[in-house]
C-alpha cells in the first residue's frame, strides 16, 4: 500500500529478470541485458491528484548506471513501446528513474538540472536542451520502493539533444 505523498506515482509491472533484487524479493533485468531481450511489462503513471497521466502502456524496465546499479535502491531505464508525453515533458520512448540513493536530501539532481535550465534560458545561444524531471513515488511489482526522480534520458533527438550524430554522417 502506498500513502499519498502528494507526488505522482509510477506503477511498474515487470515480469521476469536475470538478477535477484533481494531487498524486495523480486527478479529484475540487469543493465547488461539488451532491451530486445527484456520481457515486456506494463507501466502506469498517475498525476499527484490521482488522475491517470499515462494509461497502462507496454514498457520494458532494466537496471541502469555503472556504479549506482549496485546500490540497495536500484535506478532504472524505462523503454516504452511508443512515444508518450509524461508528466508534462515532451513525448519520447526512453525515460530514466534515478534512485538518488547516495543523496539523502534527494534534491541534488533536481537542483543541478534546474540551474542548468536557468543558464539555458539566460543564454539563448548556449545550451539548447537540458534534462527535465519530476519527483515520483514508484511501485514495482506491487512493492512500494520509494521516491525516485523520473527524467528524460540524454539522447540525440529533436525532443532531446538536437545535434547531428557524428556517427551518422
Question: Would you name each region that the model predicts?
Answer:
Residues 1-169:
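Phosphate/dinucleotide-binding and metal-coordinating scaffold of catalytic cores
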Amino acid at each position: 500500500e502506498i500513502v499519498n505523498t502528494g507526488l505522482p506515482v509510477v506503477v511498474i509491472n515487470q515480469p521476469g529478470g536475470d538478477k535477484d533484487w533481494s531487498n524486495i524479493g523480486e527478479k529484475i533485468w540487469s543493465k547488461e541485458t539488451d532491451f530486445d531481450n527484456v520481457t515486456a511489462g506494463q507501466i502506469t503513471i498517475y498525476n499527484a491528484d490521482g488522475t491517470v497521466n499515462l494509461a497502462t502502456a507496454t514498457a520494458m524496465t532494466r537496471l541502469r548506471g555503472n556504479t549506482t546499479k549496485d546500490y540497495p535502491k536500484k535506478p532504472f531505464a524505462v523503454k516504452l513501446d511508443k512515444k508518450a508525453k509524461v508528466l508534462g515533458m515532451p513525448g519520447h520512448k526512453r525515460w530514466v528513474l534515478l534512485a538518488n540513493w547516495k543523496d539523502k536530501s534527494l534534491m541534488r539532481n533536481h537542483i543541478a538540472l534546474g540551474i542548468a535550465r536557468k543558464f539555458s534560458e539566460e543564454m539563448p545561444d548556449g545550451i539548447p536542451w537540458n534534462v527535465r524531471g519530476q519527483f515520483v513515488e514508484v511501485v514495482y511489482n506491487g512493492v512500494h520502493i520509494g521516491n525516485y526522480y523520473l527524467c528524460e534520458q540524454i539522447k540525440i533527438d529533436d525532443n532531446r539533444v538536437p545535434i547531428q550524430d557524428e556517427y551518422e554522417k
